[in-house]
Amino acid sequence: MKYASNNIRNILIAGHAGSGKTTLTEALVYFSGAAERMGRVEDGTTISDFDPEEAKRKASLSASVVPVEYEGIKYNLIDAPGLFDFEAGEYEGIRAAESVLVCVSGRSGVTVGAEKAFQLARKNGKATMVFVSKCDLENANYFKILEDMKIKFGSTVCPCVVPAKLDDGTPVYINLFSQKAFKYEGGKQVQVDLPDIGHRFQGLIEAMSEAIAETDDELMEKFFGGEAFTTEEIVEGMRKGVKDGLITPVFCGSAVNQQALDMLLYNMHKLLPSPEHNSVLAEDANGEPVELTCAESEPTAAYVFKTVADPFVGKLSYLRVVSGKITAGASLVNARTGETEKMGKPLTVMGKKQTEAESIGAGDIGAVAKLVSAKTGDTLCDASRVVKLPAPVFPKPSLFMAVTVAKKGDEGKISSALARLMEEDPTLSYVNNAETHQQIIGGLGEQHLDVVKAKLKNKFGVEIGLEAPRIAYRESIRKACQKQGRHKKQTGGHGQFGDVVINFEPCDSEQVVFEEKVFGGSVPKNFFPAVEKGVRLAAEKGVLAGYPVVGLKATLLDGSYHPVDSSEMAFIMAAKLAYKAAMPEAGPVILEPIHTLKAHVPNDNTGDIMGDVTKRRGRVLGMEPDEDGLQTIIAEVPLAELANFTTFIRQTTQGRGWFTTEFARYEILPEMLVPAVVKQARKLGNLDESADD
């Protein structure tokens, strides 16, 4: 069935892992009558968690789209992962939604995942609603959670449905709008007498009324006049407050036992915005801002918010249609590449189930298979109006591991399989490090990379191992040294002869610098390039650990030649001999890469993080606040010391903190650490016999 944009609600369901997001999604599908039975996370039978890895780990690993149709309204629910290693799902989903439903566990309370989801919603200007789940459990403490929410989410928090219990312990839910109470029998609502919750009831009504009054001058006047609001005024004031970010309504219930879901669905319809009047800002072909209206009569503009790579079916692109509509055979321009994409048959998606549709209308969500150039973050638009919607900024990888191949010859397969996985996961990176000869993958944490490893095996038939990446050290010298290199070899016929005197000294360049100051014809000019080539070839391996040499200046001063036996190869060999003679006496050192670290952490954790940076041989350069209310610690730390920093910062900040690193420069490795690096170099075969003396 096709829905007008005013009858669509696009809602991201977000929160901490284990707070009940997937169970709530499943419960709403079952409540709407779209499923004959309700799946369970524990059994791996939910609609949302259809990936084999999700079923195995009993947790959401990516965002999934689950539409719920109920009483003429289509709710496109986007169930996002709560595990921090997979937070890309929240960043994808929030771009397709007008609203965010933050799920909070009635047992665990307001955990970090809920805080981060609320902040992400606010940062992106989304309407926000809270659902406190598991309220029928014995140890649920709704009112304590409510107070915590007011502290962590701010004064916009406004309870709309609160739990209570009858004398026999039966859970009931009080609707503060209607001031009526309901219990649930088999998911069906049964009105009961309003239970006595003491002074709380009047306080809740007054707090809600005051929040509503602040949305409108007339309502404010009525409030101060002591008049009660009508149900219509309550709903309209609440709706306006939600849209303007002045009110965060809080609902509650039990997803597992189908309690108070009717009130949640009704109010998601009444209080949360539809796409109809939610105009979106984009850029036109000249980079000028343009407002897109959600109407099918407008030129088409659709946003690719998620990509799924399937080795058998191919690529599936999830689209949020901002204006116009998607139809089979339509040609749309990819605003990023300028290429034209021909649309396949539009699909409606329910978890893994795909159903062909005539079109995907303005404001709705659907999918198209086998697009060629489109990737997550792209805008597909009509050629008559090329526009680009802002692409999301995803968290950057912070944990990097080297790939080891279980089966020889699979290197090529790994590259192509990882390229496919990167299409569906913007927080995954992959590079071939030419210097260390390793394939390096980067992700958001150990769980993330473990899932990547499992997907490579199960989806693409490629088995890999993961190990710490090698560090790309360098070598240099600290003082000047002048040495002769004489290469003489006599055989039958022509011999080989080359003789050079070269001065080696430190310099500021990151490369090897070559000069010549030869007087007279002791070394003919036509052999200068051979001498330079010999120096550069030799400098590819330092004498301590076989790493490339930088910051080296070599000056050719003198030498000699033989009119018959001298050759280009002879002078290359002579230059190498001079290098090998000079370097051990020139104060050789190993250089290690230093990275600039920017750690974003809560103020309470700054001391722990700075202390840890110091233990890692780092230098703290300063601290400044960031735009999200965290403190940014700026430091310089050796790359070799950052191996487990991802785990440390997450544990220390309970998942609130994050960091980025960027190469800064090379510095001399402390002498006490040199033996270990040399030992590792020997193990890797960096040192040949001539460099191993």
Which functions belong to the PLM regions below?
Residues M1-D693:
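Structural and coupling elements of P-loop NTPases
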